[in-house]
């Protein structure tokens, strides 16, 4: 029973980490859209940019704590309770294992990101924002190494593209919906920004699908092996959710932001489902 609880806790933390990174990529995309001249009046652009910077700082803090929690839970899957909570066990897994070596890279990057994001939120400067965005890109490059993508260059490249494109599409959408629900100054609500986001999201969605197919072909030796496996069932569910996301995105693009948040909220709920399924896939042996 304890093993099942730990397994699901770890999957939940993986989903939280993936989701946080997607939103961080989304803040980069949203801020980039806001930098384009003519997208919104200057006062709104400045206020929205500060709001995005604060969101990046908040998500960075959540990600930092999620990484620490992941270390504790992963250690408990290796060592029995209460030995798994000892300093020696945590150091063994976090500092002396292969998994811990990759985890350390993520922790260092997120710690640096937290410092940069805090500084960018307090005193917005172009140099600080670029440093923060650069760390987010490095974090995106490092994260796939913790899953099935590690050890194969093509698979790693495909999963990195999958994550980056997913962040541009779904992460920016999350920034838009959360910002609107919080009744902050419009982030991606202004007409020009919305339409630019749509034209950014369309190719990003295509990259998500194509990179996912490439990664699958590198992971699975024969597609027929997917049918009777848990991995294949999860992959099918994820494919259906991504297809539904595409339909919602098309509906959003056709209707524009003036029709409210009904469809964007549904799209965001589907995005959460996709992230949860991705975390489950990452923790599931492939055929």
Q: Where is each model-derived feature located?
A:
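Polytopic transmembrane helical bundles with strong interfacial aromatic enrichment
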Residues: 1-287
